[in-house]
Amino acid sequence: MTRKQRRLTMIGGSLVVLAIAAALVLNALRDSIVFFSTPVMVSEHHIQPGQRFRLGGLVQNGSLVRGDNLVVTFKVSDGSATLPVTYKGILPDLFREGQGVVAEGALDSSGVFRADTVLAKHDETYMPKEVADALKKQGHWKDDYGPQAGAVEASGKQGVSQ
């Protein structure tokens, strides 16, 4: 084998190893690439109970029920499908029916999503109340800043028990 053939063999072998490594990494990260799954995606992919993922959609109107010990149940909808959610903890300030939400947790054996983290989504015009008040006090407030809103992450790591 000549020197040129050995060099080409080494380059070709290195490219094959690199391609295999890239395929393995992409396969391992396949489920993490999507920030959240919608209720339709959950039903189409038949996610196994206990598998952690993020669920996103709108809190369905009329579905919010506050129980004892900070337990809250609601339904997340994407317009086509709906998934029941149970969460134990303090909800974000912006959490309300009809508002966008991303919850992290897992499905239980009965098909209820048990969330341990809930994020309320907001639009790009968000401004914390404290900042808006400070701007108004200093005379720098502009009416085109939009409505005052806030998004706060709530994490109830103690879990949900029923």
Curated annotation (Swiss-Prot):
- Name of the molecule in the record: Cytochrome c-type biogenesis protein CcmE
Q: Does the keyword Cell membrane apply?
A: yes
A GO biological process held by the record: cytochrome complex assembly
- Asked whether the keyword Cell membrane is assigned, the reply is yes
The species this protein belongs to is Nitrobacter hamburgensis (strain DSM 10229 / NCIMB 13809 / X14)
Q: What Gene3D superfamilies does the annotation carry?
A: Nucleic acid-binding proteins (2.40.50.140)
Residues noted as binding heme in the record, renumbered to the chain? 122, 126
Q: Which UniProt keywords apply?
A: Cell inner membrane, Cell membrane, Cytochrome c-type biogenesis, Heme, Iron, Membrane, Metal-binding, Signal-anchor, Transmembrane, Transmembrane helix
> Which residue ranges does UniProt annotate as crossing the membrane?
8-28
| Gene Ontology molecular function, alphabetical | heme binding; metal ion binding
Q: Which domain of life is it from?
A: Bacteria
